Amino acid sequence: MHPAHLLVLLGVYVSLLGAARIPPLPLNLIQFSNMIKCTIPGSQPLLDYANYGCYCGPGNNGTPVDDVDRCCQAHDECYDEASNHGCYPELTLYDYYCDTGVPYCKARTQCQVFVCGCDLAVAKCLAGATYNDENKNINTGERCQ
């Protein structure tokens, strides 16, 4: 085998090792994102809301910075309540459909109904809230006390 072929194979191998360490997005997060796209066509929820304010994304403390952040706070609280009822919101998949900008839940189990209801409420809430670019990627240590 030629040395150039070995280098190509080594490159492919290293690339595959790196890709194997990238965790996939939970299916519920993708489903949730699509529900938001139903109420806010053209949005990119995974980018727009990933690090917005004190509650949209991984953080969840302090005083919400605006209505968008209050929507995310309510969603966090709804997921907490679902967890208190024995559900696993981040892992729960459900059926829903979108009709002219309005999502509808078609959930079957109690946990699907609960989680779909949480996602439905925040999707509608975000659609009615004004997005402020200044609240994206804020210093949560300073602003979320």
From Swiss-Prot:
GO molecular function terms noted in the UniProt entry: calcium ion binding; calcium-dependent phospholipase A2 activity; phospholipid binding; toxin activity
SMART domains for this protein: PA2c (SM00085)
GO CC terms in record: extracellular region
Chain residues in the propeptide: 20-27
Cellular compartments annotated: Secreted
Residues in the signal sequence: 1-19
Protein origin, superkingdom: Eukaryota
Disulfide bonds: C38-C98, C54-C144, C56-C72, C71-C125, C78-C118, C87-C111, C105-C116
Keyword Mitochondrion: no
Tissue expr: Expressed by the venom gland.
UniProt entry tagged with the keyword Disulfide bond: yes
Any Pfam family the entry gives: Phospholip_A2_1
SUPFAM superfamilies: Phospholipase A2, PLA2 (SSF48619)
Gene Ontology terms: biological process: arachidonate secretion; lipid catabolic process; phospholipid metabolic process
Keywords carried by this UniProt record: Disulfide bond, Neurotoxin, Presynaptic neurotoxin, Secreted, Signal, Toxin
Job description of the protein: Snake venom oligomeric phospholipase A2 that has potent presynaptic neurotoxicity. Chain C is not itself neurotoxic, but it is essential for the neurotoxicity of textilotoxin. Chain C possesses a very low phospholipase activity.
Subunit composition and interactions: Heterohexamer. 2 forms exist: 2 A or 2 B chains, 2 C chains and 2 covalently-linked D chains, and 1 A or 1 B, 1 C, 2 covalently-linked D chains and 2 differentially glycosylated covalently-linked D chains. Textilotoxin was originally described as pentameric.
Family: Belongs to the phospholipase A2 family. Group I subfamily. D49 sub-subfamily.
Record protein name field: Acidic phospholipase A2 homolog textilotoxin C chain
UniProt source species: Pseudonaja textilis
